[in-house]
Amino acid sequence: MSRLACCAALGVVLIASCGKAPDAPDTEVTQGAELPAEAAQPVAGPEAVVEVPRHLEVTKDYFVGSASFDDALFDIAPDIAATLVEDARARLDAMDADALAYKAADPDYFNPYSLSIQWTLDAAAGDLISLEGFTAAYSGGAHGNYGTDARIYSLQTGQQVSLRTLLADPQGAMTESLPFVLSDIAQQRSEKAGGGASAETFRGETADAISADSILRGELGLVASTEAGRFGGFVVHFAPYEIGSYAEGAYKAVVPQSVFRDFLKPEYAGLFAGGPVTEE
């Protein structure tokens, strides 16, 4: 089966200007960051969530920003959706203020800023859901930047859950998954290069940048399965520059659940079955 995924992430450190202009104030969009409680109170209950916007947009001469959210997320996890909306609103407001300040400080070198945030519900099984995000930002440099994000949430608690939590032997699971990730990324890099280098050559280069430990520390989410109501595996995201050059862009690798199933905690094993749903 195949699925189109429109993803997006809160987690890009905006690049500074590369020209002769003085450095612009940095705006950081930190991966996985939580707003202080007073800044992002989840909306309680479905009736309150009706008032939460599902799309945010800012259009000014110095800043253009937007944030969009998967409609399904409001149905299955309204409180989580509300928190993501408020988080995105705060980030848009922060970059708006940053852009305005830089424009006032150095109008001759200023270029309008932009920020786009998207969140998609990727998969759900049992008490867990997995979200995928995409963030694209420009803060006056030679080019913009973008990044992907992945988050797993518990519907019962509304809190984020790490893949590590689901595994009885996290290190063993990542060690088993590493060869699969290396081969997958190497094949993608070879295809992007148009056959300029073999997948085996890229595999060696990729192995210098990726380890079992780095995968476990990375952006990890769960993916839908060919069997309804189950997870088919996990996905690991790599931002631009993390593996190759900026021109290569971001990468992600999907590891089938069959690769790491033996390392799952018994209470979570039943949530995994079938094969991963892949993108077209």
Regions found by a protein language model. Give the residues of each.
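Bacterial N-terminal signal peptides that target proteins for export
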Residues: 1-7
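Secreted/luminal cysteine- and crosslink-motif detector
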Residues: 7-8, 19
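C-terminal motif of bacterial Sec signal peptides marking the signal peptidase cleavage site
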Residues: 14-17
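Compositionally biased intrinsically disordered regions enriched in Thr/Gly
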Residues: 19-280
